[in-house]
Curated annotation (Swiss-Prot):
Binding site for (2R,3E)-phycocyanobilin: C81
Phylogenetic classification of the source organism: Bacteria, Bacillati, Cyanobacteriota, Cyanophyceae, Nostocales
Pfam families in the record: Phycobilisome (PF00502)
Subunit structure: Component of the phycobilisome. Heterodimer of an alpha and a beta chain.
UniProt KW keywords: Antenna complex, Bile pigment, Chromophore, Electron transport, Membrane, Methylation, Photosynthesis, Phycobilisome, Thylakoid, Transport
GO biological process, one term: photosynthesis
Gene Ontology CC: one annotated term: plasma membrane-derived thylakoid membrane
Record protein name field: Allophycocyanin alpha chain 2
Keyword Cytoplasm attributed: no
Keyword DNA-binding: no
Known role: Light-harvesting photosynthetic bile pigment-protein from the phycobiliprotein complex. Allophycocyanin has a maximum absorption at approximately 650 nanometers.
Length: 161
């Protein structure tokens, strides 16, 4: 839920108009929207590189994943892991666009730990693959942009563990 929606819902629940402070926060949010959209575009354009490099990193750090019997063993299973990584990167872009973690929480986190456990997928490796994408992504961005995007990766990592 965006900051604007939260403020409107809070004001409505309290049967009041938006306060000057809330209007200032909305103004800041609106002014930052162009930068957030540029970040989303940059991440979207770099997604193949981010996922490929992060996959290479995670498979080197966790060779058991691609070894016979591992969750990413074989071409199809490796592709499935990379697909999941791309999915999480897409959720990050949704949250950057929204300026809020709601897309990660509502689309990506609900039930994911249970699903991975039932499939025998090591959640630590999933969290580490997201961390690898974070490291690659933030190294491509400047300070403030890297910090903002990193916040959403950290939120996802924390909720996967």
């Amino acid at each position: 839920m965006s900051i604007i929606t939260k403020m409107i819902l809070n004001a409505d629940a309290e049967v009041r108009y938006l306060t000057p402070g809330e209007l200032d926060q909305i103004n800041i949010f609106v002014k930052s929207s162009q930068r957030r959209l540029q970040l989303v575009e940059a991440l979207t354009q770099s997604r193949a590189t981010i996922v490929k490099q992060a996959g290479k990193d995670i498979f080197q750090r966790f060779p058991r994943l691609v070894a016979p019997g591992g969750n990413a063993y074989g071409e199809n299973m490796t592709a499935t892991c990379l697909r999941d990584m791309d999915y999480y990167l897409r959720l990050i872009t949704y949250s950057v666009a929204a300026g809020d973690t709601t897309p990660i929480q509502e689309i990506g986190i609900v039930g994911v730990r249970q699903m991975y456990r039932s499939l025998g997928t090591p959640i630590d490796a999933v969290a580490e693959s997201v961390r690898a994408m974070k490291n690659i992504t933030t190294s491509m961005l400047s300070g403030e942009d890297a910090s903002e995007v990193g916040t959403y990766f950290d939120y996802l990592i924390t909720n996967l563990q």
